[in-house]
């Protein structure tokens, strides 16, 4: 569907941030691996997280879905052979983390993961190589390092290395499966470690489900090491916090328009890397008050140019791009070369679509240089949910924006339009 965005005058009200997509993925998987029945409170049911949930069901876990909770009967690590190929649609998190999880199935079993056209271009070779060193038989069906992925049961354990500069999901993947390996697992992360907060989130989740681990960061950023011994996940009652990634669109709208807005369910002590959005909008000129579990923002809509390294928060690239497009002066984003390996090449596509709405932009290998003054135009979403939501927010400020293939926002924020309509004043 094409979505035409109309200009509004103000953002105001009180709204609850949606549940975290990243925490929901990890909680669904941990609960599926646990011994006993877990209760997951306030989970996110979006296209991506449902892909993880349904994949876990195919691997043997039982899920009862309710609007405000999910009750999960875990497998205690006894993974079932799926009756069919597991299609995770567009969810890179699902295919990457569950490829390791599938390896803890009995040795005679095979699991095959596939997805949509975009997912079948996502790089997996670094994870494949790291898992092979742990005794896992895993391959790309096309022998090109991308899905479909074929996994044979059998996770021996031992020691392996992995590069840290492509995707933190590879690291989270091995960490989540490691407790059910036959031998202890030592995972060494080499080189630049991007998106590290996501790994910290993984460690936080598994610890809530009873997993112990050791962590050595003596020589950061050159080297990090994780050590996990064989053990079982324990069922628990777990509440999923709000999502700073999804809330970034709400906060960006409040920063670039006259506003008086409170966003609940965002925690001051959150481990989410995208929490940096608070510091960014402050430095660009918005007034922000952060309480324990909510954020209040007031703005006159006039933003200042700003330079930022988003190495640990690459999902914010589209959001920060449109904020900078509306700021006075020249801004620069660096540190996001790994964003070229997301649902799309987000660095390139942000540059192209900013130019399509009249913004002066220079594409760098690891970022963008942006000079503001957008005029509007036709935007291709590239079937990327974050592109849709970012350019929708820009449209609220300037009007005259039409977004192609806009329905994919349901990948991470199913009620995005409803929320934005609630806080918009014409």
Curated annotation (Swiss-Prot):
The keyword Cytoplasm applies. Catalyzes the transfer of the enolpyruvyl moiety of phosphoenolpyruvate (PEP) to the 5-hydroxyl of shikimate-3-phosphate (S3P) to produce enolpyruvyl shikimate-3-phosphate and inorganic phosphate. Pathway: Metabolic intermediate biosynthesis; chorismate biosynthesis. 3-phosphoshikimate binds at residues 21-22, 26, 167-169, 195, 315, 342. Phosphoenolpyruvate binds at residues 21, 92, 122, 169, 346, 386. It is found in: Cytoplasm. The active site is at residue 315. It comes from Methanosphaera stadtmanae (strain ATCC 43021 / DSM 3091 / JCM 11832 / MCB-3). This is 3-phosphoshikimate 1-carboxyvinyltransferase. Its EC number is 2.5.1.19. One of its GO terms (cellular component) is cytoplasm. InterPro entries: Enolpyruvate_Tfrase_dom, Enolpyruvate_Tfrase_sf, EPSP_synthase, EPSP_synthase_CS, RNA3'P_cycl/enolpyr_Trfase_a/b. The keyword Cytoplasm applies. It comes from the Archaea.
